[in-house]
């Protein structure tokens, strides 16, 4: 059970285990003496939540269903998760712009502000490896929710929300730069942190650690399994 704005509501359902992570950095057989190399940790995502969601969350969900119409709502909202007092609507990626525009414009919703875009890479979430999360805020109603959209590694396309929330401009560029998510419809989807000719996306879980020359003084950072251990 969780508490959402003082009203008891249903928490997340059974966690969905998508991977088992061994070691802190994925390196094996290294000279690591910290003990972190022996860590074994399950990677799990929160499960879907039952009603009542708690607090204003039920009002938001009902208002969105009324504004979209039940058929479009059912085709758009894949799952609802209440976890740590936060409401997350998992949205079918093709429906993201219409859902975001409805959340922004409907008088009962009025989520006028998108606070950014965060990327996450879950290699164990088969067919949904790349996630993009959008925290939204209603200044009118003083409420917060989150949208989340997933795409597979082999088709990393998600519609841009620039036309709905122009503030996502640089955030989508950064998420593209670091995770390789392609935001279709973005007016200028170019790298924003890494050099234009950089190969790969460095915050993905499959991006190699170390072994990249540090050009400004000629040193080299070795991969974790080649690093020297100090006692």
Curated annotation (Swiss-Prot):
**Which family is it part of?**
Belongs to the complex I 30 kDa subunit family.
Task: Note the superkingdom of the native organism.
Answer: Bacteria
Which key words are in the record? Cell membrane, Membrane, NAD, Quinone, Translocase, Transport
Q: What membrane topology is annotated for this entry?
A: Peripheral membrane protein
Entry's localization field: Cell membrane
Reactions listed under catalytic activity: a quinone + NADH + 5 H(+)(in) = a quinol + NAD(+) + 4 H(+)(out)
Residues forming coiled coils: none
Identify the Gene3D superfamilies for this entry. NADH:ubiquinone oxidoreductase, 30kDa subunit (3.30.460.80)
On subunit structure and binding partners, the annotation says:
NDH-1 is composed of 14 different subunits. Subunits NuoB, C, D, E, F, and G constitute the peripheral sector of the complex.
GO MF terms, alphabetically ordered: NADH dehydrogenase (ubiquinone) activity; NADH:ubiquinone reductase (non-electrogenic) activity; quinone binding
What does this protein do, in the record's words?
Answer: NDH-1 shuttles electrons from NADH, via FMN and iron-sulfur (Fe-S) centers, to quinones in the respiratory chain. The immediate electron acceptor for the enzyme in this species is believed to be a menaquinone. Couples the redox reaction to proton translocation (for every two electrons transferred, four hydrogen ions are translocated across the cytoplasmic membrane), and thus conserves the redox energy in a proton gradient.
Q: Tell me which InterPro entries the record gives.
A: NADH_DH_suC, NADH_quin_OxRdtase_su_C/D-like, NADH_UbQ_OxRdtase_30kDa_su
Which protein are we looking at? NADH-quinone oxidoreductase subunit C
Q: What is its EC number?
A: 7.1.1.-
Single GO cellular component term: plasma membrane
SUPFAM superfamilies in the record: Nqo5-like
Q: Which Pfam families match?
A: Complex1_30kDa
């Amino acid at each position: 059970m969780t508490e959402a704005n003082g009203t008891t509501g249903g928490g997340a359902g059974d966690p969905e285990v998508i991977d088992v992570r061994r070691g802190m950095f994925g390196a094996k057989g290294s000279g690591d003496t910290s003990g972190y190399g022996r860590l074994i940790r399950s990677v799990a995502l929160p499960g879907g939540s039952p009603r009542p969601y708690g607090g204003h969350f039920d009002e938001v969900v009902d208002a969105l269903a009324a504004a979209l119409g039940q058929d479009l709502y059912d085709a758009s909202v894949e799952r609802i998760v209440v976890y740590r007092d936060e409401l997350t609507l998992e949205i079918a990626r093709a429906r993201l712009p219409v859902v975001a525009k409805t959340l922004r414009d409907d008088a009962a919703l009025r989520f006028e502000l998108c606070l950014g875009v965060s990327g996450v890479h879950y290699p164990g979430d088969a067919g949904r490896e790349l996630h993009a999360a959008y925290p939204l805020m209603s200044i009118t109603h003083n409420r917060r929710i989150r949208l989340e959209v997933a795409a597979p590694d082999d088709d990393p396309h998600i519609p841009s929300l620039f036309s709905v929330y122009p503030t996502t401009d640089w955030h989508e560029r950064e998420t593209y730069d670091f995770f390789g998510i392609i935001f279709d419809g973005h007016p200028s989807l170019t790298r924003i942190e890494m050099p234009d000719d950089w190969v790969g996306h460095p915050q993905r879980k499959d991006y190699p650690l170390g072994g990249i020359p540090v050009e400004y003084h000629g040193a080299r950072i070795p991969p974790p399994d080649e690093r020297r251990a100090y006692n």
